Amino acid sequence: MQVDHSTIYRWVVAYSPELNKRCRRHLKSTNDSWRVDETYIKVKGEWTYLYRAIDSNGNTIDFLLTENRDAPAAKMFFLKAFGHSDSRKIRVINTDKDKAYPKAIKELKELDILPDSVEHRAVRYLNNIIEQDHRYIKRRVIASQNFREFKSASRTISGYETMNMIRKGQIQNVDRGDILGQKKFIHSVFGIAV
């Protein structure tokens, strides 16, 4: 059977958000030390911003593609990330020196969404681990020769990020490097007989 690459791309755009949703309930817990950063992604020839958070062990917490790089975008990202993680368990958030982060974190503390006890450290070298983690996603984006639409970019990146979480061994009972276990897991969440 031959399948055209554009058909596969349509499947990726259609099913990536569903894969992410179904994988979330099977993720191992992350720790209380977050690394947050954003990286640039071109969509329609314009720069957009992929916000990402991982814990100090390199486990992905969440991601969000936005059109802006500012405090409201950072706040929106944190709110999304807190939806997938208990914000009451966070001890420290490490970021680069982007001025949007302190403002967003301050607003979230004022709204009592983030505890006052959470420490914010704006120290560039503490984020080396997330800068390295960006590489996997950036390689996929470059291989896809950038994106033509924001919605399809967001959905495709969701697939890249979800597969990266599976690859890194973040799924319960599926180890890093266990390709067969990863395949069985994906089949099981979609109800496909192996």
Task: Show where each model-derived region lies.
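Residue-level recognition of single "structural anchor" positions
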Residues: 1-194
